[in-house]
């Protein structure tokens, strides 16, 4: 499960088996893992994060969307 980036307490990653789905990113903090689609950026699964934190994560993903998409393309184009 390749880690694309770590920002503060959040680890942004995808699973190697995610190839057959549209581009997305998982974000983990402690025992919570949420999933966001990347095109357009939107929440797919909240992973039991609270709404306020999900909004904060959404902004981080929007700010790093290009990097996350490049990481996705790079990994899954192999």
Regions found by a protein language model. Give the residues of each.
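Compositionally biased, intrinsically disordered low-complexity segments enriched
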Residues: 7, 26-28, 66-67
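Short leucine-rich amphipathic alpha-helices used at interfaces
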Residues: 5, 31-32, 75
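A short, structured beta-strand/loop element
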Residues: 15-51
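Short, charged/polar N-terminal "headpieces" of proteins
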Residues: 1-21
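Generic preference for hydrophobic/aromatic residues in regular secondary structure cores
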Residues: 4, 43-45, 64
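C-terminal structural segments of small proteins and small subunits
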Residues: 51-78
């Amino acid at each position: 499960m390749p880690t694309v980036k770590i920002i503060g307490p959040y680890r942004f990653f995808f699973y190697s088996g995610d190839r057959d789905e549209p581009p997305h990113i998982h974000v983990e903090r402690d025992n919570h893992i949420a999933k966001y689609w990347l095109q357009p950026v939107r929440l797919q699964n909240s992973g039991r994060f609270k709404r306020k934190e999900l909004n904060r994560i959404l902004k981080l993903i929007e700010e790093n969307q290009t990097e996350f998409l490049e990481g996705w393309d790079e990994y899954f184009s192999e």
